[in-house]
Design a protein with these regions (language model features):
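Conserved glycine-rich cofactor-binding loop
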Residues: 16-18
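Conserved Rossmann-fold SDR core element
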Residues: 27, 84, 160, 170-182
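Substrate-binding pocket helix/loop in short-chain dehydrogenase/reductase
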Residues: 93-108
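Active-site loop-to-helix junction immediately N-terminal to the catalytic Tyr of the SDR YXXXK motif
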Residues: 104, 145-153, 165
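Active-site helix of classical SDR
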Residues: 119, 155
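Residue(s) in the substrate-gating loop at a strand-loop-helix junction
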Residues: 139
Length: 182
């Protein structure tokens, strides 16, 4: 499949395993250079090595997306190491936290606040690209009520709204914004 992504650069949060790593490998197979981040150094290093073995450039760092300085430093380092940024995928989620204040707080900080911070940090690079794009990895929990992980669904709904607004706000700058809910 040719997605016309050869020589483009995409950053993906939470990309050392799972859906994030699968996206990184798919983009690398299309000829994309990839920025990887996650919280585990061994997993980040293994993911970077696997992507580089596919014949493209990869840059990875240990990042806790709730740490603004770390998140912004990763974005800047990726832009420098990979020669700019054409796309950004907001993939990290705190997941199914308890329906307690701590669960709400961790989901808000990792999902919503980190996505907002990342979009603000990556926006200048995407404006400089001829194909700037942002993708948010959502969930059907943003649209349907599920028993259990209430904070998760609420934050995914907030992200769906936020990225919908960003699609309108960033369109004049030539930046596409989409949400995908696997």
């Amino acid at each position: 499949m040719d997605l016309q992504l050869k020589n483009k650069t995409v950053l993906i949060t939470g990309s050392s395993k799972g859906i994030g790593f699968a996206m990184a490998k798919t983009l690398a197979a299309e000829g994309c250079d990839v920025g990887i981040c996650a919280r585990n150094a061994d997993e980040v290093n293994a993911a970077v090595a696997a992507i580089q073995a596919m014949g493209v450039k990869a840059h990875g760092q240990v990042v806790d997306v709730t740490d603004s300085a770390s998140l912004e430093a990763w974005i800047k380092a990726c832009a420098e190491a990979l020669g700019g940024i054409d796309g950004f995928v907001a993939n990290v989620s705190a997941g199914g936290a308890d329906n307690e204040e701590s669960g709400w707080r961790s989901n808000f900080e990792a999902d919503v606040l980190a996505s907002w911070k990342a979009v603000n940090a990556v926006k200048p690079y995407l404006e400089a690209s001829d194909c700037g794009s942002i993708v948010s990895i959502g969930s059907t929990a943003s649209l349907e009520a599920f028993a259990g992980a209430v904070p998760y669904g609420a934050m995914k709904a907030a992200l769906l709204n936020y990225f919908g607004n960003m699609a309108q706000e960033l369109a004049p700058a030539g930046i596409r914004v989409n949400s995908v809910s696997p």
